[in-house]
Amino acid sequence: TGSTLNAILTFQGSDRLSFWEITPEWLKHFEGSLRARGCSWNTVSTYLRTLRAVYNRAVDLRKASYVPHLFRSVYTGTRADRRRALDMEDMKKVFARLLQSDAITPAMKGAQELFILMFLLRGLPFVDLAYLRKSDLRGNVISYRRRKTGRPLSVTLTTEAMFLLQKYMNREEQSPYLFPILHSDEGSPMAYREYQLALRNFNYQLELVGKLLGLKDRLSSYTARHTWATTAY
């Protein structure tokens, strides 16, 4: 489809892609870039299954060499949306201060408070949080574009949101980013790797927080947005 082609060409950075360039490593990086852009697993699967169909057709026409299990390492199935919203009881637990104990680390506390900030910013996705720029903040208003859709959004910060933002904002004067999540130039492979590592660590810390709080559902970076959408409407 046209959307699949556009996604591939955007990732490739050119208007050409040869079949011999499609390797398990290339596919894994393509899958990762789609997730970094905010695509759901089902969207990722749609793109990869479309590409696989084109590849298989090319093999049949002897336009491409057959590579066994080429798509084995990437996701080509379908899954139900598991981004469950927290109920009010669990959200109260998340907003409550974690009691001091040996089980709580600074990383867990930071993840909990960033999660609260994302919720207060109308369910801001982690990918948008990571790529926010200092220039996006003017006074108590953040204006930015969703990386997934390109849609422009503005959010007015509450007192609590401003407190958390000022607590965790980037102190490095030379950095254009509002938060110290990324350090490399936007769009570079290194920035993508930094984002992936930060997201993985954020979700790991949130999972620990969720277990410590005894939440009924798994706490993850998606939960803030899904919960905000549920409570807002």
Segments (PLM) and residue ranges:
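Short, basic (Lys/Arg/His-rich) helix/loop patches that form interaction surfaces
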Residues: 101-106, 203-233
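Conserved tyrosine-mediated DNA breakage-rejoining catalytic core shared by Y-recombinases
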Residues: 72-73, 131-170
